[in-house]
Amino acid sequence: MATVGMNDVKNGMKILVNNEPAVITETEYVKPGKGQAFTRMKYRFIKSGRVVEMTMKATDDVEVADVVDTDMRYLYTDGEYWHFMDPESFEQVQADKAGMGGAEKWLKGEEDCIVTLWNGAPIWVQPPNFVELKITETDPGVRGDTSGGGGKPATLETGAVVRVPLFVNQDEVIKVDTRSGEYSARVK
């Protein structure tokens, strides 16, 4: 594997920490008046999402992770694995529940996703920013029940539950922001 010196470390770079891929989110090069220069950095583990801060000497090296972000199309799930296809090479990969990272609740089929591959296996799936899903179950909105502009829970066709405004009814298609898990708009 390739290594990089602390002078070449940048935000967004993918590195290996204890044989697990991580993304550098913050770096700060510090050169004190007395003593050796060092780099303070924060990184987020791709699989678990855990954020860690580390201080390294200027002479240290970090190992670059062999991680690739690939545009892929979600095909189907067989209950245990979620199957994705590269639209250019038609190569297929399958992700398990841990590799999905919670994205499975936004996917119904034929969505374009960004799949992070490490050693050829998917370790993280990023769904599209917005998806259109049908509401399968929600309580009817009661007229006049709007003091405070509240909302109500709605179950979507993929099993995800989001809060929707009172005027949205069952069997309607809504647009959901997958980054926050919030209702965005009704689809006509």
From Swiss-Prot:
Cellular component aspect of the GO annotation: cytoplasm
Pathway: Protein biosynthesis; polypeptide chain elongation
PTM annotation (N6-(3,6-diaminohexanoyl)-5-hydroxylysine): residues: 34
Pfam families, A to Z: EFP (PF01132), EFP_N (PF08207), Elong-fact-P_C (PF09285)
CDD domains recorded: S1_EF-P_repeat_1, S1_EF-P_repeat_2
Keywords noted in UniProt: Cytoplasm, Elongation factor, Hydroxylation, Protein biosynthesis
SUPFAM superfamilies documented for this protein: Nucleic acid-binding proteins, Translation proteins SH3-like domain
Gene Ontology molecular functions: translation elongation factor activity
Post-translational changes noted in the entry: May be beta-lysylated on the epsilon-amino group of Lys-34 by the combined action of EpmA and EpmB, and then hydroxylated on the C5 position of the same residue by EpmC (if this protein is present). Lysylation is critical for the stimulatory effect of EF-P on peptide-bond formation. The lysylation moiety may extend toward the peptidyltransferase center and stabilize the terminal 3-CCA end of the tRNA. Hydroxylation of the C5 position on Lys-34 may allow additional potential stabilizing hydrogen-bond interactions with the P-tRNA.
Classification via SMART domains: EFP, Elong-fact-P_C
Family: Belongs to the elongation factor P family.
Functional summary from the UniProt entry: Involved in peptide bond synthesis. Alleviates ribosome stalling that occurs when 3 or more consecutive Pro residues or the sequence PPG is present in a protein, possibly by augmenting the peptidyl transferase activity of the ribosome. Modification of Lys-34 is required for alleviation.
Protein name as it appears in the record: Elongation factor P
Taxonomy of the source species: Bacteria, Pseudomonadati, Pseudomonadota, Gammaproteobacteria, Lysobacterales
